UniProtKB/Swiss-Prot annotation:
GO molecular function: rRNA binding; structural constituent of ribosome; tRNA binding
Oligomeric and partner information: Part of the 50S ribosomal subunit.
Domain of life (superkingdom): Bacteria
Source organism (scientific name): Synechococcus sp. (strain WH7803)
GO biological process: translation
InterPro entries for this protein: Ribosomal_uL16, Ribosomal_uL16_bact-type, Ribosomal_uL16_CS, Ribosomal_uL16_dom, Ribosomal_uL16_sf
Keyword Magnesium: no
Identification of the protein by name: Large ribosomal subunit protein uL16
HAMAP family the record matches: Ribosomal_uL16
Keyword terms: Ribonucleoprotein, Ribosomal protein, RNA-binding, rRNA-binding, tRNA-binding
Cellular component terms per the entry's GO annotation: ribonucleoprotein complex; ribosome
Record function comment: Binds 23S rRNA and is also seen to make contacts with the A and possibly P site tRNAs.
Similarity-based family: Belongs to the universal ribosomal protein uL16 family.
């Protein structure tokens, strides 16, 4: 299971999930990726379950990159505990996910779009957030389509 080796503070506040991912929202390593469509918390167990599902499907065919890391501790109180007496102990670790964040990437010579799509579909079932399959070609096309429009807008003003 993924978790930080050491942290400066043992306990964190829960926080709010607003806005979209400004970092980690483009494909950096592979040819195919799984992108989050909504915000949420993904635990280290869910990340590991998704990784296992993908690895078992592609076998030794390609490489899988995990682009998220669970760095937020979630605390819980013992069952049937009275109110007060401080914050609970850290029970598990989560990664905070915002829409647009790339969760997993996949690439390699033997990985076809069909294999990658099926492996990512198996991983999707293990995750608590809505996701979509994207490829490097789709990302470049969407970036290429928006670039001329942005350039035209800057020329006119």
């Amino acid at each position: 299971m993924l978790s930080p080796k050491r942290v400066k503070f043992r306990k964190q506040q829960r926080g709010r999930m607003r806005g979209v991912a400004t970092r980690g929202n483009t494909i950096a390593f592979g040819q195919f990726a799984l992108q989050a469509q909504e915000c949420g918390w993904i635990t280290s167990r869910q990340i590991e379950a998704s990784r296992r599902a993908m690895t078992r499907y592609v076998k030794r065919g390609g490489k899988i990159w995990i682009r998220i890391f669970p760095d937020k501790p979630v605390t819980m109180r013992a069952a049937e505990t009275r109110m007060g007496s401080g914050k609970g102990n850290p029970e598990f670790w989560v990664a905070v996910i915002k829409p647009g964040r790339i969760l997993f990437e996949m690439g390699g010579d033997e990985i076809t779009p069909e294999i990658a799509r099926e492996a990512m579909r198996l991983a999707q079932y293990k995750l608590p957030v809505k996701t979509k399959f994207i490829s490097l070609d789709e990302q470049e096309q969407s970036a290429g389509a928006s670039a001329p429009a942005a350039a035209a807008a800057t020329v006119e003003s």
